[in-house]
């Protein structure tokens, strides 16, 4: 029996490196080995690609537990030491033997169209979105513009380039205070997992938050805080789409930040979301609208703020490679829709191998 070879890409150069490893471990455990041959491909923080060998060893590590019991820095050091000890050369595999790639690369250099473009050039089908949708949705500011153009409500915001802020920080402070009211959120535009996001409650906190975000990204979004529940929808499909039931996150801290997600595990998840049924249907319709407007394929998780007292639905962001960790919403939402984890990976691989309408041979 022929087994389709799936290259599971994980790690990567972004600040979400360790989260990618946790996601990949869950994906690897839920791919049907009777149907697929999995080739683990680990990408180091400095861009080295390693297949098999040390990549397989890293997948066996319980990275989530390592982060909780030691630290993020110690975990990163462990991964570096494992690669060095293996003495394997990077780029030790041939793309020609791969039938489909399954990138579980969160953040820059993985979720932003770069890897998707490489795979497309090599004519290797890839799970999830293509180059354009991946690049567009990686930029929170551009995503909001596209969502608003599609008729979705978005939070009021201002965008600043990091170099412009360093040149004249006071101009940015004046613009933010004149355009928005407190509380605000300051966000690097291209990072996920809530990395670098700060909630700002007063003008005295603004400079530190923007400086921090500018140290992580070339562009920063300063956004009006939105009242409402954090509601998420999983979407799957290419031409024919399916939206999951709505899920809700109740943060364990002021907002659903990196530590709340992956270290303290204090957030509460509710499926279905605690909003009326008719409002849930409107959120699901809005998720499908965003998915289509942004040109998504394969999968995405679409996030909103929902106020059940006013019926307000505000688009927040879309994740084209959502988390697949044990605490991640995307696989949980798909399970609530009747698609278990192993069936989910199978569907995503099959969707990747469908030809895109209008694509040249």
UniProtKB/Swiss-Prot annotation:
One of its GO terms (molecular function) is D-alanine-D-alanine ligase activity. PROSITE patterns: ATP_GRASP, DALA_DALA_LIGASE_1, DALA_DALA_LIGASE_2. It is found in: Cytoplasm. The keyword Nucleotide-binding applies. ATP binds at residues 177-232. Binds 2 magnesium or manganese ions per subunit. Pfam families: Dala_Dala_lig_C, Dala_Dala_lig_N. The keyword RNA-binding does not apply. Keywords: ATP-binding, Cell shape, Cell wall biogenesis/degradation, Cytoplasm, Ligase, Magnesium, Manganese, Metal-binding, Nucleotide-binding, Peptidoglycan synthesis. Mg(2+) 2 binds at residues 317, 319. Pathway: Cell wall biogenesis; peptidoglycan biosynthesis. Mg(2+) 1 binds at residues 303, 317. Its cofactor is Mg(2+); Mn(2+). One of its GO terms (biological process) is regulation of cell shape. Its EC number is 6.3.2.4. Residues 144-350 form the ATP-grasp domain. It catalyses: 2 D-alanine + ATP = D-alanyl-D-alanine + ADP + phosphate + H(+). GO terms for cellular component: cytosol. Belongs to the D-alanine--D-alanine ligase family. Cell wall formation. NCBIfam families: D_ala_D_alaTIGR, PRK01372.1, PRK01966.1-4. This is D-alanine--D-alanine ligase.
